[in-house]
A protein has these predicted regions:
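Insoluble glucan recognition modules
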Residues: 1-174
Length: 174
């Protein structure tokens, strides 16, 4: 997810909503961390710099199929307008990237069509299953697509601008 984190905030993860159950984990270092990918471990992940962070946790079965390999990646959020209203379907285009000012992410003025938004997870178009990081705004709330099918169409007109506030999981189209 995309979160605003203050310097020295600490994160830990769990498979349950409880510290008493599940599999609690952090990373393998006590040092404050900047953007990067870190191996799972027992230490809290301490954030080095304040700002918005895209936090992605991956858990994969080890090659010997005996353990779960955990990793935590932290990066700068990169949010885009895609499809007919923005950059199309073939490559990430910086002209269609949202800009963050004062905690709000703002899009460039969109083209007419059905709005589709995504979070860029890797540097290669298509390598990140960008469709799984798609989201849209419904009734003023940000809703992610996840592994489901296409979301309900959100029609927009030429020149409208999308604003997103991930602190409140809200957005608007004006």
């Amino acid at each position: 997810g995309i979160y605003y984190l203050s310097a020295n905030d600490q994160l830990k993860f769990n498979s349950e909503l409880s510290w008493d159950n599940g599999d609690n984990f952090g990373i393998d270092s006590k040092d404050p961390q900047d953007y990067g990918e870190y191996n799972g471990g027992s230490e809290n992940l301490t954030v080095k710099n304040a700002g918005y962070h895209l936090v992605v946790v991956t858990c994969e079965l080890s090659a010997d199929k005996k353990t779960i390999v955990k990793k935590v990646a932290i990066s700068q959020p990169r949010v885009y307008v895609l499809g007919d209203c923005g950059m199309g379907w073939s490559a990430y285009d910086e002209a269609w990237k949202f800009r963050e000012t004062g905690g709000v992410f703002t899009s460039p003025a969109v083209k007419a069509g059905n709005l589709r938004l995504c979070v860029r997870l890797t540097d290669t178009w298509g390598a990140d299953n960008s469709w799984q990081s798609e989201f849209n705004i419904f009734n003023g709330k940000i809703e992610f697509r996840g592994k489901g099918g296409d979301q309900t169409a959100v029609p927009v007109t030429v020149g409208q601008v999308v604003s997103l506030d991930f602190r409140t999981n809200s957005g608007s189209i004006q």
